[in-house]
């Protein structure tokens, strides 16, 4: 929305959880300025392959969630760095300050809510931590998947626990925080008051365990890994085809009746399979019978057959195939580097803001390390260039 162009976000960020959130805000049209330490910076800048010849801290992994932002380097461990932070918040009229630093660093860096609220009373302050504001335990996505129960639910029953293929606790926490920021912006628009938001990645992760926690704690059921099958519905699984694999998900008894009415699957039209409970009770044999038939069919013909009777089915797409999907390809985001001409292709948001649509789904290229120091500190804050040089030599920026 155009109104998001009036929102300025200052984010002391690194890794994935907070950069993905601010990337979402940049897509909406917010001005996002990422803060990094002038020596260490965001470690994710060094992850993946370097692809811009002769340039450091612009590796491939960093590119995916940092387009549309500006970048400042600032040493908040220095008093002069904290003075600049105060000026940034005040002079740029910052609406949202966000950090995923450990809570023990808040006071040392001068970034605590009370400190920044004193500078701008209506500031919205967001702190993302692994296990809450009282904990300084380091948390990375796989650790959250392990402790948060996701690994216990992922993988084959006879195999080892597995992580899911994307950093779900990271990105899911970002989505939860996004919603909380929208609520805070609305509250501020109505009341004029800012707020403090603390988001725990662990609590975000465990909030998704709706069925597992209820089934375990209320009904004493052991919810565990089941590979590609479903705990409560059958047949639901990946089935082999003559040229690959197909996922079929029969969601209710009516769909199974249509499924078993097909000549190819008529052997499944048994009284004991009429209800889902009977199919679950004999799911191993059921899946073996289905697999014997699907092996003789092409993936395309099987998917076509299932869709014709209202049963959900899909081939197992590669990422390249997903990017070419007609529902995805037109919505991909592009970000072109004006210096080298290199163009990034970025995943689309679930719903594109009108501003993104109006500019042809284009964002500015992910910022280089400290790229906007001069533009922001000199042109907007009025710090003379010779003072900027001194600040750099002193390790402040």
What are the roles of these predicted feature ranges?
Residues 133-134, 159-166, 189-205, 221-231, ...:
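Conserved Rossmann-fold dehydrogenase catalytic segment
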Residues 167-182, 201-209, 251, 255:
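Mid-domain beta-loop-alpha active-site segment that forms a flexible
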Residues 307-330:
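Conserved PLP cofactor-binding pocket of PLP-dependent enzymes
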Residues 174-194, 207, 211-218, 260-267:
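Oxidoreductase and adenylate-handling cofactor-binding alpha/beta cores
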Residues 1-190, 289, 368, 375-397:
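N-terminal helix-loop segment corresponding to the beta1-alpha1 unit
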Residues 39, 130-132, 201-206, 243-245, ...:
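Glycine-rich beta-alpha junction loops
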Residues 235-309, 313:
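Aromatic-enriched alpha-helical interface/lid elements that frame and gate functional surfaces
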Residues 2, 337-390:
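Flexible, small-/acidic-enriched active-site or ligand-binding loops
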């Amino acid at each position: 929305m155009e109104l998001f162009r009036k929102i300025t976000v200052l984010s002391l960020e690194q890794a994935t959880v907070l950069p993905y959130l601010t990337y979402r805000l940049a897509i909406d049209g917010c001005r996002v300025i990422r803060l990094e330490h002038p020596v260490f910076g965001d470690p994710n800048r060094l992850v993946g392959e370097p692809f811009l010849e002769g340039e450091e801290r612009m590796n491939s992994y960093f590119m995916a969630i940092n387009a549309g932002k500006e970048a400042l380097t600032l040493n908040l461990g220095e008093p002069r760095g904290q003075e600049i932070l105060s000026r940034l918040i005040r002079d740029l009229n910052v609406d949202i300050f966000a950090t995923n630093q450990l809570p023990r660093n808040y006071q040392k860096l001068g970034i605590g809510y009370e400190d920044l609220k004193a500078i701008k009373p209506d500031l919205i302050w967001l702190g993302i931590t692994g296990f809450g504001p009282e904990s300084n335990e380091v948390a990375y996505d796989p650790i959250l998947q392990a402790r948060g129960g996701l690994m216990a639910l992922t993988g084959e029953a006879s195999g080892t626990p597995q992580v899911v293929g994307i950093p779900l606790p990271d990105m899911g926490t970002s989505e939860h925080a996004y919603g909380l920021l929208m609520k805070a912006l609305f509250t501020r628009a109505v009341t004029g008051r800012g707020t403090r938001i603390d988001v725990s990645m662990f609590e975000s992760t465990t909030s998704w365990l709706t069925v597992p926690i209820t089934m375990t704690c209320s009904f004493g059921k052991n919810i565990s890994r089941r590979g590609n099958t479903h705990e409560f519905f059958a047949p639901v699984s990946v089935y082999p085809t003559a040229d690959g694999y197909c996922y079929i998900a029969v969601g209710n008894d009516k769909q199974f009746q249509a499924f078993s009415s097909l000549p190819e699957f008529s052997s499944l039209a048994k009284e004991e399979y009429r209800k889902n409970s009977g199919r679950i009770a004999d799911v191993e044999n059921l899946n073996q019978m289905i697999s014997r038939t699907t092996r003789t069919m092409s993936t395309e013909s099987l998917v076509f057959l299932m869709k014709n009777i209202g049963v959900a089915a899909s081939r197992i797409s590669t990422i390249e195939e997903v990017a070419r999907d007609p529902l995805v390809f037109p919505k991909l985001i592009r970000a072109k580097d004006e210096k080298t001409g290199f163009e990034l292709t970025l995943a689309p948001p679930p719903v594109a803001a009108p501003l993104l649509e109006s500019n042809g789904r284009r964002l500015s290229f992910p910022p280089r390390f400290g790229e906007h120091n001069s533009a922001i500190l000199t042109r907007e804050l009025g710090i003379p260039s010779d003072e900027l040089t001194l600040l750099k030599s002193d390790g402040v920026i």
